[in-house]
A protein has these predicted regions:
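Mg2+-dependent phosphoryl-transfer enzymes with acidic/Ser/Thr/Gly-rich catalytic loops
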Residues: 2-4, 23, 149-229
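Asp-based phosphoryl-transfer active-site loop
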Residues: 4-20, 179
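Walker B catalytic acidic pair
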Residues: 12, 285, 363-365
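Active-site phosphate-binding/coordination module
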Residues: 21-105
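Short, well-ordered beta-strand core segments
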Residues: 65, 185-187, 202, 385-386, ...
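Conserved acidic, metal-coordinating active-site core of Asp-based
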Residues: 88-181, 190
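Phosphate-binding and hydrolysis-coupling loops of NTP-dependent motor/remodeling domains
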Residues: 221, 229, 404-484
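P-loop NTPase catalytic phosphate-binding loop
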Residues: 228-359, 368-404, 454-485
Length: 485
């Protein structure tokens, strides 16, 4: 799917249906979406056996079920497992002895809000750490730190989908965590006011009709939202307000003169993405981004270790959910260009299936994406693509135009942010978390011309030892005698 979203997590009661079973129209829309490659996860506070009693063929219509408000997870293999430890049986026994009408799940205890005081008193009496969660007129008693968000995380992990590639849809009090955990949170029209206020999108339709609306838009690739919780702060505007840009569903062009600070700004954006747990792949043609490899969850390949096959990079991202910096700086120019083109095409192809990496950052983009580049892989414009260049005029037309955001780096302290339909705004970049050294390997490992080499001298003059770059200089210095030093 050439769309950012690869999964939709849907609440059941009040969202997918108001009755015991979704309508035929809703089930048909779900089947069409799954046929287009979208995974559907049903996320409910219901006890699993009760859900299957009212909707016996539920497993045939979804890719996974999160039941008991995150406490139980199923998957397509037919397995059912607890995603949290069950509550002590002593609590259920005490509640039933107190006259509370109770239903026992694999993890949670379910009752109604009329018994909330009795439940709270029993929890206090036993000294338990648990939580009480309201769902309209229902009351659930759950282990601490168990929610629809925690259960969804496990279900998506089983499916190989990141929460950043998921839309969450709900209607009630226990859906707040579901919406917050997903890239975009959606409230159906009949949702409670608090959830409507918190949602990124509020649908025009209620429950099942709203679900049909969302699934249609996801398959078409027309979902458009900019959640404030998923933004990268790059600096400060002249008026003192933070300069933020969306962390997903956009394409970005970073341009500016050589030495102005383009790679610094691109690295600043990459750090922000990593802080928000997006998966990125940086094609580093000049060795500007080795410090990103020091971040947790980031792997560096290439450089002094030599290149790995492009499919190896794809596997690192797919199976380890790792971000990768591909250091091409020590390779010949034509090798860098050819490798970057091959890897970019392969990453985009695999991302259509998995959603990963969320972002591809191509530094020195004019090298692989010059005027002769066959730009079919860039049609339609990929979301999550950041091109960095000091020569935008020689980018192929498809790569040069149509970006959602442009960052014109005028100097290390001045960047102009431009978005379609908005006036350009100047901001001053933040400090980086990692050290930025421009063209690192060019100075540390690429040999200089003979006339520019370091020459070592002893008491009697030159001793025949030279160094063509900083790595050689360091080695020679360590081996030199005191008289040379």
């Amino acid at each position: 799917m050439r769309t950012w979203f690869h999964a939709v997590a849907i609440d059941y009661d009040g969202t997918l249906t108001l009755g015991r079973r979704p309508t035929d129209a809703v089930l048909a829309a779900m089947a069409d979406a799954r046929g287009a490659g979208l995974r559907i996860v049903l996320v409910t506070g219901r006890i699993l056996s009760e859900l299957r009693r009212d909707f016996p063929d539920v497993d045939a219509h979804v890719d996974a079920i999160v039941a008991e408000n995150g406490g139980v997870v199923t998957h397509k293999g037919g397995g059912v497992r607890r995603a949290a430890p069950p509550l002590p049986s002593a609590l259920a026994d005490l509640l039933e002895a107190s006259g509370v009408q109770l239903r026992r799940g694999m993890v949670l205890l379910a009752t109604t809000m009329e018994y909330d005081a009795a439940v709270l008193a029993a929890v206090r009496r036993l000294g338990l750490e648990c939580q009480l969660v309201q769902n309209r007129g229902e009351l659930m008693v759950l282990p601490a730190n168990t929610s629809k968000a925690t259960g969804l995380e496990e279900a998506l992990s089983d499916l190989g989908v990141s929460p950043h590639n998921c839309i969450g849809i709900g209607d009630a009090e226990n859906d707040h965590s579901l919406l917050d955990a997903c890239e975009v949170g959606v409230a159906v029209r009949n949702a409670i006011p608090a959830l409507r206020t918190r949602a990124d999108i509020v649908l025009e339709q209620e429950n099942g009709a709203g679900i049909i609306e969302v699934l249609r838009d996801v398959v078409r690739g027309t979902v458009n939202a900019e959640p404030k919780r998923w933004q990268v702060e790059l600096g400060t505007f002249d008026d003192g307000s933070p300069a933020r840009i969306p962390a997903s569903q956009r394409s970005i062009l970073v341009q500016g003169a050589s030495g102005a600070g383009k790679s610094y700004v691109a690295g600043l954006f990459a750090e922000g993405l990593l802080d928000l747990e997006y998966t990125i792949c940086v094609l580093d043609l000049e060795g500007d981004h080795p410090a990103l490899g020091e971040r947790r969850g980031v792997v560096t390949v290439g450089g002094v270790d030599g290149l790995v096959p492009p499919e190896h990079v794809v596997r690192l991202i797919r199976h380890r959910l790792a971000s990768v910096v591909v250091d091409l700086s020590l390779e010949p120019f034509e090798t860098r260009k050819a490798y970057a083109r091959t890897l970019l095409a392969e990453l985009l192809e695999r991302r259509a299936d998995t959603g990963l990496p969320h972002w591809i950052i191509v530094d020195e983009a004019h090298v692989p994406l010059g005027p002769e580049f066959d730009a079919q892989c860039l049609v339609p414009r990929p979301q999550g693509l950041c091109l960095v260049t000091y020569r935008p005029e020689i980018l192929c037309p498809t790569a040069a135009t149509g970006h959602d955001i442009e960052l014109d780096v005028r100097s290390p302290d001045v960047v102009i942010l431009t978005r379609p339909g908005e006036p350009p705004r100047r901001f001053h970049p933040n400090r980086r978390d990692t050290v930025h050294v421009r063209h690192w390997h060019k100075y540390t490992a690429v040999p200089t011309a003979m006339a520019l080499r370091f020459v070592f001298r002893g008491p009697g003059g030159p001793n025949g030892r030279t160094a063509g770059h900083l790595a050689e200089f360091d080695a020679e210095l360590r081996a030199a005698s005191d008289s040379v030093v």
